[in-house]
């Protein structure tokens, strides 16, 4: 389970930038819940509008490598203000706590690499089920994810046939396989169940443009309903307003595109 760091952010995310955004929660209900999943109780953060008429459209928010820290919680609050029930499950909770790692390389090797994709996808199924029992509309299920969660977002779009729409922010597209990660997004382009919007950056040294073009070609070959937008002046994690690489113009445009994607493909109110 993710513990609370004094700043509200994982230590490996330091240094923090002064551009970080905090969304007030006066118009929303937000907090921590526990979701039964595969014999365990998975912690999750949720946010929803206080005033709602019937079941809410659902957005599962998938964490960055840093876990469900303050930025991901704020993403949930922003989505709640847009009328969604947003849930961010702590998908590392069985393997460890990201707050125990002081830097990104040890966080990746000591925790993130130990989390099996199959476990994550099954956990997300339980999140969707929890949402449908707690004020969410099972027929309007969406997902978005950032960095590590961006890759998972692509995979989940190929995993869950009930998903209506997905938006993946700067998630890895190609790479070496392992027992825990047997496939990458490029491998499942033919299997997408829902329209996927990918938001990427031209200056991302961890996701080169060659891999983005490889994914585009795979999507075209599969005739998949998907779109990839590249922001030429932005780097990796351009939406992470708490980090020095935050690129405000790209982040704002990406956020608006995400909302429009959800509105277009997210399903009709029952």
UniProtKB/Swiss-Prot annotation:
Task: Report which superkingdom the organism of origin falls in.
Answer: Bacteria
Report whether ATP-binding shows up as a keyword of the record.
Answer: no
* Stretches of the chain forming a coiled coil according to its record: none
Q: Where is the active site?
A: 147, 204, 236
Give the EC class as a word.
hydrolase
Catalytic activity field? 2-(5-oxo-2,5-dihydrofuran-2-ylidene)acetate + H2O = 4-oxohex-2-enedioate + H(+)
Molecular functions (GO terms): carboxymethylenebutenolidase activity
- Under which EC number(s) is this enzyme classified? 3.1.1.45
InterPro entries in the record, alphabetically? Answer: AB_hydrolase_fold, Dienelactn_hydro, Dienelactone_hydrolase-like
Q: Which UniProt keywords apply?
A: Hydrolase
Q: Name one Pfam family in it.
A: DLH
The record's similarity note reads: Belongs to the dienelactone hydrolase family.
UniProt-recorded name of the protein = Putative carboxymethylenebutenolidase
Question: From what organism does this protein derive?
Answer: Salmonella typhi
Tell me the gene name.
ysgA
